[in-house]
Structure formats: structure tokens, C-alpha cells
A protein has these predicted regions:
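Surface-exposed cleft-lining segments at the edges of enzyme active sites
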Residues: 70-71, 136-146
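Glycine-rich, positively charged active-site loop/lid region within alpha/beta enzyme cores that binds
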Residues: 121-141
Length: 200
């Protein structure tokens, strides 16, 4: 990323960064943009509107207290609720969310309130270069080498396209999740997944 002058986004869960604060501070020190992945890798489905609002604000506060900066992006485990995007906009500090799987290109959210200085951006999430494909027996990746090659090819293609079209695209590398077991042990690795390619 440094070689190409690209920015990167760390999509992190609040509990994960609280468990490993040095990693969160290091990401910021290295210039990573911080995006919130929720409190844990969980869906807000089933929460009341007020519970979801608190879930969002608590997640933001936890990340900001560790990293020293607030997250500017959001992507929770699907499915999100009918309230999620509106609550993110009302919270006021998010530039974009990635709770969409319906397109390859980003877009402005048409219902962004007119009093905002800039429209809210929907930056669709792609499962194509996500570790989700490890879970598919027929179309999955049996080896790390194959997955790495696939991701590198996708990155190279997107990088070339950005240079030609000047469009913003999103790329995901392998994402590992923190999980807390019943015994209180933590398993997994810090989730660092996103590169924004703007062609600027």
C-alpha cells in the first residue's frame, strides 16, 4: 500500500480493539482510516431502535477511546435493520457505510438529510474476495496460496481500472474475526480488510 500511495481502512470491532489497544493505536499511527465493525461481529437484527442506537454509539465511543480517533466508516454483520443507515446518519460522524451488497460502485444515499454538509456514501461490500469463500466447498479456496493469488489479481485489476476510470472501488483482503469464547479466551486476529482506491 505504501508503495502505491494508497490509503487503507481497518474495519475493527469495538471489543477487539479494547482487548488489543496497541494494535488500534498502531493502525492510527500508520495512517489507517478507522471503520467500525460494530461492538462485535454481530448483527443488529432483533434490537429495538433505541438498543441499536446505543449499540452504535457505544461501539464508536469504545473505538475512539482506544484509537484517539472516531471511525468514519461502518459495516456490521448482515443483516442490518431498516433503521441502521438512518441511525448512522443521525449519529453524525460517519462518512459512509458498507451495509449494501447490491452493486460494485459507490453511490450517495438519496435520503441524506439536507442539513448535512456532505451526502452519506454507500460503499457496497463484496463477498468475492472475502473469506466467505472458504466456507463454500465447490467454489472455495483450498489453499492460502490460491486465495492470495486471487486477491492479488483482483487488486491489480481494480488498481488498473481506477487509474483508467478515476472511479472509487473497494477491495477486501482476508478478514479474521475476534471471538470471545465462553471461558473468556479470545480467538482470531485483528480484522484489517479494506483498501480504498480513488485514483487521485
Amino acid at each position: 500500500l505504501r508503495k502505491h500511495g494508497a490509503t487503507a481502512t481497518a474495519n475493527i470491532c469495538a471489543e477487539a480493539v479494547q482487548l488489543y489497544p496497541a494494535l488500534g493505536r498502531d493502525l492510527v499511527a500508520r495512517g489507517f482510516e478507522i471503520s467500525c465493525h460494530g461492538r462485535r461481529w454481530e448483527t443488529p437484527l432483533g434490537l429495538t431502535e433505541e438498543e441499536e442506537r446505543k449499540w452504535i454509539t457505544d461501539s464508536v465511543a469504545a473505538i475512539e477511546s482506544v484509537c484517539g480517533v472516531r471511525p468514519v466508516g461502518w459495516h456490521c454483520r448482515c443483516p442490518h435493520t431498516v433503521n441502521t443507515r438512518r441511525l448512522l446518519i443521525e449519529e453524525g460522524g460517519f462518512i459512509y457505510d458498507s451495509d449494501a451488497y447490491d452493486d460494485d460502485l459507490p453511490r450517495f444515499f438519496a435520503d441524506t438529510p439536507s442539513d448535512r454538509s456532505q451526502p452519506h456514501v454507500i460503499l457496497p461490500y463484496s463477498l468475492d474476495t472475502n473469506d466467505m469463500r472458504y466456507q463454500l466447498a465447490a467454489a472455495g479456496f483450498p489453499t492460502a496460496t490460491q486465495f492470495t493469488e486471487y486477491c492479488c489479481d483482483a487488486f491489480d485489476w481494480l488498481w488498473d481500472e481506477v487509474r483508467k476510470t478515476r472511479r472509487l472501488r473497494r477491495f477486501y483482503a482476508k478478514n479474521d474475526h475476534f471471538t470471545k469464547t465462553g471461558s473468556g479466551q479470545t480467538q482470531g486476529k485483528l480484522k484489517i480488510e479494506t483498501c480504498f482506491l480513488s485514483g487521485r
